[in-house]
Amino acid sequence: MLRFDYLLITALAISTVSVVMAQVPPEKQFRVLNEPGYAPYITEYDASYRFLNSPNQNFFTIPFQLMFYNTTPSAYVLALRVGTRRDMSFTRWIWDANRNNPVGDNSTLSFGRNGNLVLAELNGQVKWQTNTANKGVTGFQILPNGNMVLHDKHGKFVWQSFDHPTDTLLVGQSLKVNGVNKLVSRTSDMNGSDGPYSMVLDNKGLTMYVNKTGTPLVYGGWTDHDFRGTVTFAVTREFDNLTEPSAYELLLEPAPQPATNPGNNRRLLQVRPIGSGGGTLNLNKINYNGTISYLRLGSDGSLKAFSYFPAATYLEWEETFAFFSNYFVRQCGLPTFCGDYGYCDRGMCVGCPTPKGLLAWSDKCAPPKTTQFCSGGKGKAVNYYKIVGVEHFTGPYVNDGQGPTSVNDCKAKCDRDCKCLGYFYKEKDKKCLLAPLLGTLIKDANTSSVAYIKY
């Protein structure tokens, strides 16, 4: 027994030492300086960018490249870009390392003997790292699919960018319930920090949320689809026979288990069914090899896919899927389609609701500021104006609200809630929906669907 314990302890010690001793060889180590100077070609967000240069490391695997970029002065993000400099349509940023914690001029990206990839300021303050020190990392690589990896001596990934998505999924990249389970939008093109829109995978489905008021509101997604814990963005040939011409399909694939019928009983804003039975959702079909594609949650809350056709002489990028479109879910269902506020019908912003009625819409149309009208339980009157035949963007995903209840009770709830900008009432079903955010109001042919907006 003592001999067995001794052998076990010895084996564990040898294993531990072997991991600690597995180090990055000198010829694969690097330290890159974020030096002043900019590259000349156009890129997404109208960003300025800088190349990374090291005699020990290539940061470019066509068409993906690791670079620094900035949209505001002295605030740089380490990011992966897709596209080549000859592209007439601009190259795209598909992964950010430190978008919530940018660095300044002369910051450094270092990959030392211990295998930790570290982004630090000139004074040594660490702004981002992979936390892979002494975990057996022996090399750095950017793969042809856009996955940036740190691997051990056997080629096994110790860390990979595919496990840390920001607002974008590349082909083969996943969201996982037991891992990073969401995409988060940028705040704007100029501000790359986390924005108000997210797409979250849980055991109920893949759901899109907007949170501008402290209350997450559902506005899209596949809320009743069982992805079995994992959803992967994929592009596959329509036909398996490689000798025959084939279209390519953009898919959202669940974990590879026996398929179940996802059901679909509340898709009130949907123009056509999205996806098919069997668990896999078919987003679109394209007539070329779309292996280089990505799915992006935009700063405006949109969900779009873009595909890259490198054989084209210009305009290599094409929008190949849009969740809010004439073909899928109505454009009016996007909360920001009419900006901060507006009345939408058939993909057009046709009016600006006011207490005096519908006025001509412009990008200056804004909801009323109502906090001063909140009664707060003190009996102060709250005024509303009425809009007939309209629904809220979140209505289809919350079964039009709570009920049955009376319109007076619905009003009383909104009166008492300072965050409530208005309420939507379904007269036929006696359903009540309180709205802390208005955004785009959607025309409803059913005149029993009525909105009451505070002013």
Curated annotation (Swiss-Prot):
Positions carrying S-nitrosocysteine: C374
- Annotated signal peptide: 1-22
When the coding gene is removed by deletion, what phenotypic consequences does the entry describe?
A: Defect in both hypocotyl and cotyledon photoresponsiveness during deetiolation.
Q: What are the residue boundaries of the Bulb-type lectin domain, all occurrences included?
A: 43-163
Example GO molecular function = carbohydrate binding
Give me the glycosylation sites of this protein: N106, N191, N211, N241, N289, N446
What's the protein name?
A: EP1-like glycoprotein 1
Report the source organism. Answer: Arabidopsis thaliana
